[in-house]
Amino acid sequence: ISDCLVGSEMCIRDSVYGDTDKDAAFGFAYAQAEDDLKHVEMMIKMSRGELSNLNFNSKTFAAIYSLITGSGDIMENLDAIEGVELDFLFKFFNVHETVNNKISEIPEETINYIKGYADGLNYYAAKNPNLVDQSLYPATAYDLVAGMTFRMPLFYGIDHSIAELINLMDDQEEKVAMNMNAPSDNPIVASINTYFKPSGSNAFAVSKSRSQDNETMLVINSHQPLTGPVAWYEIHIKSGEGLNIMGGTFPGSPFVHVGFNENLGWGATVNQPDLSDIYELKLNPENNDQYELDGAWVNFTETDQEFKVKLFGPFSITYPIQMYHSAHGPVLKDDNKAYALRFVGMNDVNHSTAWLKMNKSKNIDEWLDALRMEQLASLNLVY
């Protein structure tokens, strides 16, 4: 039994109970912090674009200097700094601005639930000040929304498009990481596919009319690692407001992503559908801060971003970096060329509502209503 009994929340492992959904989310967060604080805090850092707040060394300095000035190989510079690859993408996707502009669209019911989860993390931190990284608290609903907004494209292989984008900037198109959607007549892909053995998550459902014991069966065989930030954390969450869900979630996520309630269940798999496009932009030869759009020269939208590098103790250095956006999406550019990336879900922030609706669904129509929000476009779902 956990000690997270506060008011109406109670944890009796592996279950969390609360009078309201928000109460249950509070207890859920507290229990998850007890069990996997390391990865919960990692998710908070990622949700703020701060994974690269690391120890300073000469290699770090050289890599960040190259990123800021645009010199050297971009991928090599990113690889030199632990966590900075994800921080770079977080800032490249301009997650903060997207969330700032759209968080008001999230229903109050969803925000209250997420706040309950954040409050649970903060309560754990208050009770265990010597165990936590106090610089991360208080965690907020904003953090959690930003984290889910950022993570969703990562599930469908947006890294392949990023690799292609970077290689185009480096004039090394054939160095692109393998993309499962690339034409099979591409000699590089054909060579790799000779050795590639298909693998991945799977799920299937069997109707009671087709089972020998007249029972409905759902098999969820998602291929996740046994440890780490995307290992499943299993939980049963029940509230007096209709939440009664059991299944798997990730550290730092307030919702069950695969599982069942008393009415229905689902599994999910992830593959690499074609959900992104790269645009080559025509630069104004007289002003490379402009690109052509509908026959006219328009300015790139510029945002000032920062990478924070830890020195020692409470001291750190902040390095500025400028990011560019076009009407098509985020841009990588130099004096001679520019490429923009557009991807599914680029401006979506309401994933939380879709997950909460699925968690509380009473029938297939309610469950499908959650999917019709089109916030989880990259997932294959088995009901």
Each language-model region and where it sits:
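Substrate-recognition/specificity elements adjacent to catalytic centers across diverse enzyme folds
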Residues: 8-9, 13-228, 240-242, 246-249, ...
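Glycine- and hydrophobic-rich flexible loops that cap the catalytic core of alpha/beta enzyme folds
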Residues: 239-251, 255, 259-264, 268-383
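A short, polar/proline- and glycine-enriched secondary-structure boundary/capping micro-motif
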Residues: 26-29, 228-231, 275-282
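Single conserved hydrophobic/aromatic residue that forms the stacking wall/gate
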Residues: 1-7
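Amphipathic alpha-helical packing elements
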Residues: 15-16, 205-206, 214-226, 231, ...
